[in-house]
């Protein structure tokens, strides 16, 4: 089995079999070297090459092994070089002053498109230095500029299409076990250089080496120009079938399982560091390991064996398929059958993420200012999002706003809809909290032509957006809401810091009816929910909505946190934002679900979400629950479960798992505190649950699987008495005072009076609630 695997892996990285002598290489045999350490290093080198799937030819490996059995002599040194030199792309000479000079070696300059090729580098180290040995190339520079946070790309960051095309390589010195990143100090040793080519065909590259700062020789002699011949890879055509047999888009993570030079995503195909969405056949993102392909599309892979992990968002069960790409063929076909554990759309619930971006954060701002929104739509399809709001914001604002139409993106269809809307972030009001504006008709604030002219606090922007039919809320709510004294208790009564960009000024604007939804799912749950619970306890009826803030808080995938909504009428963008306003939705990581939440038969999001009781008494609470956890917790799940809730992923069902079981707890919440719990098996099956709590005062009820999913509230009024928890109102008033202290210095002088009046108006609201709650 080991022999056949080794042969197969040779097919992945066949360069070490390309041994024809380079026409112009000189004789670089080095004498006067101790044979014992050189032979020991050669044996480690052979072992490392085997680990990386690049073993020496069998005959050469046998010759090396034979040298171990013979006497150690000058002949041993010569024979080692005779065996290894034909594999060398370059010969590096470090003179006694530590200067590096590079010559061409004997190996043929043959690469493979879309794959790694390994060569040896012979190092004649006269200086005996032990610095880190590195390989570089201008052809391996980043083919993009990232991260991006500028409103417009800076001139010095601009890359032309020609520059991008010339950056087709990745190059690394392999320093994994049993090798090491530093030179040993021995007069002669060998290193392994691994080169990846994005392209096929003839390509010239400049390859350079150094052994620490300032080691380059005069006249740029530490580099060589090499004309490579990159052999074409195999076209692997994908046939992707959904659970019902229809063709679809899905997510694919392709790995070879081999040892590569250290670095992010080095064993992943296509190599992320060479991906440029603007110019590639398919717009794969360089900061993600996965790619997205629909049936009929393809990926190019060099011959070899691969592991493909494929799925389509959290409603699907991830699967693994091993594929073999043979040599000597132009293309092959591979089929993938997706497997769901649940299909919420069939139950009347549709997935949505109101916060994704085509620019900023992990995206590049050159060669283009972010990606085209149509590239984001592939991500939406591949993660099975029915609805997505692609938000233009500060970074690359002036370019990205050109995609704003106040209509659905043209690629939208009956099952998947995307619209370009706005996040007011990177604007003068951002210090008070970033805000999401959905379904707006106009994206320029009245009287402005530049970002700098927008208001410096959030209320005017919210009011303007709502005046044009927009549905609005604060983004990444928990940022800035960390308690002054650390606690994860829910609810808690510690004043928040109010020093961030989340739902900070929400404490003001919620009192004026300016907020439709409160974002959840992408910041620590205690910070998000503590603010939310306290404002509900003051009688405000803001609804929860799930968001990811891709690719900022996470660049893993869109829809990592999401809403599931039940449209009142059509499943379209209007139906979606209406469902958010009404609370016909719940927040979820997609791995647990709280459907059809009702109190005395009234479903959340209907009839003002309010149940009226004449006097204290019991109510019947029902919901339909579904959750999915693997039967056995894997290492990734265990890591998530043990991580502090202040570390990502903030919302994940692994945090909800009861010990090592497959059980999660559905909690009934009244006014923010759990009052009952039911254990549910996370086996993917639908489970109907019910509670019968006694309600002794006006308040609100919700169901949560913490921190994986959370329903919207249903409000219960007894004898039409208001919901007014004194302690919550006191907390809100303290938070308001802290917010003014932190935000007032950054509000423009000419706007400060209006802001001060709004804060004072909110103070009066909370004081009245405190007085009401005291009765």
Model-derived features with residue positions:
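Catalytic cores of extracellular degradative/oxidative enzymes
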Residues: 292, 315, 319, 345-544, ...
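C-terminal functional module detector
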Residues: 151-153, 163, 168, 172-177, ...
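Mature N-terminal segment immediately following signal peptide/propeptide cleavage
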Residues: 33-60, 251, 350-355
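Bacterial N-terminal signal peptides
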Residues: 7-17
């Amino acid at each position: 089995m080991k022999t056949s695997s080794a042969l197969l892996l040779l097919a992945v990285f066949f360069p070490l079999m390309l041994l024809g002598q380079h026409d112009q290489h000189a004789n670089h045999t080095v004498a006067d070297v101790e044979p014992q350490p050189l032979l020991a290093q050669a044996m480690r080198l052979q072992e490392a090459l085997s680990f990386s799937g690049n073993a020496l030819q069998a005959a050469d490996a046998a010759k090396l092994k034979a040298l171990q059995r013979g006497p150690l002599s000058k002949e041993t040194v010569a024979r080692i070089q005779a065996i290894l030199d034909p594999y060398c792309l370059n010969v590096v000479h470090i003179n006694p002053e530590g200067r590096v000079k590079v010559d061409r070696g004997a190996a043929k300059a043959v690469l493979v498109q879309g794959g790694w090729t390994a060569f040896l580098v012979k190092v004649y180290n006269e200086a005996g230095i032990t610095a880190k040995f590195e390989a570089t190339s201008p052809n391996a520079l980043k083919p993009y500029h990232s991260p991006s946070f500028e409103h417009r790309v800076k001139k010095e960051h601009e890359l032309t299409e020609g520059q991008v095309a010339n950056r087709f390589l990745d190059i690394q010195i392999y320093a994994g076990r049993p090798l090491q990143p530093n030179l040993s100090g021995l007069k002669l040793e060998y290193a392994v250089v691994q080169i990846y080519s994005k392209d096929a065909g003839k390509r010239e590259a400049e390859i350079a080496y150094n052994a620490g700062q300032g080691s380059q020789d005069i006249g740029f002699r530490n580099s060589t120009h090499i004309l490579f011949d990159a052999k074409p890879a195999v076209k692997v055509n994908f046939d992707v079938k959904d659970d019902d047999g229809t063709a679809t888009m899905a997510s694919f993570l392709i790995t070879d399982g081999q040892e590569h030079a250290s670095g992010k995503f080095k064993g992943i195909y296509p190599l992320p560091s060479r991906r440029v969405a603007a110019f590639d056949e398919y717009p794969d993102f360089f900061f993600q390991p996965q790619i997205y392909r629909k049936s009929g599309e393809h990926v190019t892979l060099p011959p070899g064996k691969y592991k493909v992990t494929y799925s389509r968002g959290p409603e699907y069960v991830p699967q693994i398929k091993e594929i073999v790409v043979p040599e000597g063929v132009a293309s092959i076909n591979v089929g993938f059958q997706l497997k769901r554990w649940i299909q919420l759309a069939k139950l009347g619930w549709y997935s949505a993420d109101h916060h994704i971006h085509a620019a900023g954060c992990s995206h590049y701002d050159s060669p283009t200012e972010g990606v085209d929104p149509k590239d984001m739509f592939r991500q939406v399809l591949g993660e099975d999002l029915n609805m997505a709001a692609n938000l233009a914001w500060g970074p690359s604002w002036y370019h990205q706003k050109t995609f704003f139409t106040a209509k659905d993106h043209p690629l939208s269809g009956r099952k998947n809809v995307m619209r370009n809307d706005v996040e007011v972030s990177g604007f003068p009001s951002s210090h008070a909290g970033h805000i999401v504006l959905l379904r707006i008709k106009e994206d320029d604030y009245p009287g402005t032509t530049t970002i700098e002219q927008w208001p410096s606090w959030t209320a005017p922007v919210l009011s303007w957006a709502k005046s044009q039919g927009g549905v609005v809320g604060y983004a990444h709510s928990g940022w800035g809401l960390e308690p002054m004294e650390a606690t994860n208790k829910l609810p808690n009564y510690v004043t928040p810091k109010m020093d961030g960009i989340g739902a900070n000024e929400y404490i003001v604007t919620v009192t004026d009816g300016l907020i439709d939804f409160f974002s959840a799912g992408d910041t620590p749950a205690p910070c998000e929910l503590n603010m939310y619970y306290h404002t509900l306890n003051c009688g405000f009826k803001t609804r929860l909505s799930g968001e990811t803030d891709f690719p900022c808080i996470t660049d893993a995938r869109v829809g990592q946190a999401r809403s599931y909504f039940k449209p009142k009428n059509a499943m379209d963008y209007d139906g979606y934002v209406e469902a958010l306003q009404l609370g016909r939705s719940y927040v979820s990581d997609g791995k647990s679900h709280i459907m059809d939440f009702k109190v005395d038969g009234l479903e959340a999001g209907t009839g003002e979400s309010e149940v009226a009781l004449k006097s204290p008494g019991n109510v019947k609470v029902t919901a339909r629950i579904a959750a999915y956890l693997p039967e056995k917790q894997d290492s990734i799940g265990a890591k998530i479960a043990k991580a502090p809730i202040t570390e990502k992923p903030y919302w994940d069902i692994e945090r909800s798992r009861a010990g090592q079981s497959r059980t999660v707890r559905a909690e009934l919440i009244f006014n923010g505190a759990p009052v009952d719990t039911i254990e549910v098996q996370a086996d993917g099956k639908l489970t109907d649950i019910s509670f019968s709590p006694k309600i002794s005062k006006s308040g609100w009820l919700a169901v949560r699987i913490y921190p994986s999913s959370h329903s919207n509230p249903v409000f219960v009024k007894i004898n039409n008495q208001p919901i007014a928890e004194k302690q919550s109102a006191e907390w809100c008033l303290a938070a308001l005072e802290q917010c003014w202290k932190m935000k007032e210095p950054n509000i423009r002088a000419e706007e400060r009076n209006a802001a001060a009046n709004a804060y004072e108006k909110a103070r009066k609201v909370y004081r009245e609630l405190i007085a009401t709650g005291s009765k």
